[in-house]
Amino acid sequence: MPEMFRYCGQVFQVHKRAHKTCDYSTQYPYRTRWLANTVHLQTRCDGEAHDGCQAGCLLYWKSAWLKPLGKRRDSNDRKGTQAPSFPGIVPVRSQGCNETAIWDRIRVTDPVGGSLTYICQMTQVRQATSALAWWDVRQYLEDYTSGNVGIATLCKAFAYSVYYHLSQAGIGLGPAMRWFYDRVNPLRGGTLFPRKPGEIPEGSPTPSGLLNLRPGELVRVKPHLEILKTVDSSNRNRGMYWDAELVPYCGGAYRVLKSVTKIIDEKTSRMIEMKNPCIVLDSVICRARYSPCRMLCPKEMYPYWREIWLERVEGQAGDGPSAEKSMRLSVREDRQGQKTIPQLEIKR
């Protein structure tokens, strides 16, 4: 995509191996799909070439577009077009392209209705991937062997998944298991049971709150139980879903990264203009810990927050974790037992 051009020639460390990724083009619950020969670097799309889409998606990089440091070749060396070899990634030979062709493919206008649709990495996930069953154990082995997550994170994710499915099995254990989770897990530094329904009856209006937040302001995420008072029994506030992946951030203090008013819808490939702006918080990402059909997905999408779920913090952060501390702790936890991650240069 044109948004990737500015990274060419720069050096980055591999952030995650993108052997699987979430597919948001289908109906909920979303699922993961296999993705070959791809990694994530710490690079995000700024949406400049896609009419200012503000989703800020983590970019996918094919191995053919990268080369390991220490193995640079002269630009006149034709062998330099060969894809590098990384552990667990099958090299493929590039077929070639040019910037004009890329620019020509980012917008498509319907010749009949005149509606505009967009082509980007996110709208093409289904075309670039293959089906992956949530129970396919190979994906979890690669989560660990690739260095995406450590053994502790993997075990915690499996433990929660088993616990959750037992609580939902309809054998009469659900209420007791959720009560036990709420009493014991906070003693271990964890959260309340993350998948609780909202308190407002479905179909009833949900409240709004307006803080007029600006980038750089410090906010605190309200407690989980307080947020449940603002969402209906399907966990939505004016259409926006309150997801279990947001629960670990409750009580934490974070900087506002941006206010989001428009994004490209991955289902329709059309630009969505939001009726109510939502907030993205710095260093706050989806870690796919509590989503059984997409567990440990490395996509790291930015979650969206209603302002009514946040409260402005005057001065410095309080007793909740800061964004920087939260990110350091989560990365450290994710990467316990990881192998050394290589640095790569993006080809020009």
Segments the model singles out, each with a brief description of its role:
Residues 216-220:
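Generic structural signal for buried aliphatic residues
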